Amino acid sequence: MARSLKKGPFVADHLLKKIEFLNVKKEKKVITTWSRGSTILPIMIGHTIAVHNGREHLPIFITDQMVGHKLGEFSPTRTFRGHTKSDKKSRRP
């Protein structure tokens, strides 16, 4: 279910404050966050945000095509190791 338009997009307060502070200073620094549910806003474009995936923080460079998506969409939490290859020689006839 989509979020109500009257509420607006969710962005963690601490993350928004850090972004606004860096925009005022015109600095580009990696911002570490655990807030995977925060929505990407246009003021975040050009910043690098390190999003936690459960084990480590993955740096993500924010582009204009990412606006409206969540931060967690760009840091995968599961490792896909590939499907097991079936060995037909070891099978019984």
UniProtKB/Swiss-Prot annotation:
NCBIfam families named in the record: rpsS_bact
GO CC term (a single one): mitochondrial small ribosomal subunit
DNA repair recorded as keyword: no
Protein name in UniProt: Small ribosomal subunit protein uS19c
GO terms of molecular function: rRNA binding; structural constituent of ribosome
The encoding gene: rps19
Annotated family: Belongs to the universal ribosomal protein uS19 family.
Subcellular location per the Swiss-Prot or TrEMBL entry: Plastid, Chloroplast
Protein role: Protein S19 forms a complex with S13 that binds strongly to the 16S ribosomal RNA.
UniProt entry tagged with the keyword Lipid metabolism: no
UniProt KW keywords: Chloroplast, Plastid, Ribonucleoprotein, Ribosomal protein, RNA-binding, rRNA-binding
Pfam families xref list: Ribosomal_S19
GO BP, sorted A to Z: ribosomal small subunit assembly; translation
